């Protein structure tokens, strides 16, 4: 970071070396806030609600990140603004699931908008003003600490990578997302307790909108099995449905489990195999919860 004084010229020399990727240089500048004593925390303190939008652009297709942290200056800005106004809404725009632990409890709410297109501003405004009830779910896992992840040069997913194999506590699980309303799930019910061969099994759950707003919920169906756990597999998503439920109403949501959902690669015979045994199918709002019913697959 180089402070620049008005009216002065500066000679900047940048050296870069790239073996395979074309090197790019980007210059950005930030006007000082204190010309007239106006600072972000002062504006926040004088406001009923503070909205702080932070963007992260430290990664791209042509290069990797050094770590999964927000910048120290950004974290300090969050601390100053939320201290000045506890009623702060933090909007985060990033293409990666970055670490949120240093500030996750500071704002009143966090809206993660990823990297939007030209309609991003309108979409965000509609959510903030209550014209749209948010229903998005995280397509990745937000870990509590980057040390929970295996080395990034290891592509072995079975070593604790993703919601399928990681067994520790996370910040926000795969499939997580809040709404302005509140949904409740009944216990799932299956139409049969045993299946074999190419049979299918239906699992049904009732989702009720117990809040004060109409809303959409993304109902998710996960499958797990003790025999999978031997190889480290915790669970896998086999289906999801977006359903609209008016306030005070309920909807029945069903999923079909088929033999293809049970398949695992058998290294001994080098083919996909559906192992006989007990399975659990769980219908939940995200991968961090469990609302399961069991059935038995009898094999071919």
Predicted regions and their residues:
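C-terminal non-catalytic regions of proteins with extracellular/luminal or membrane-system context
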Residues: 1-300
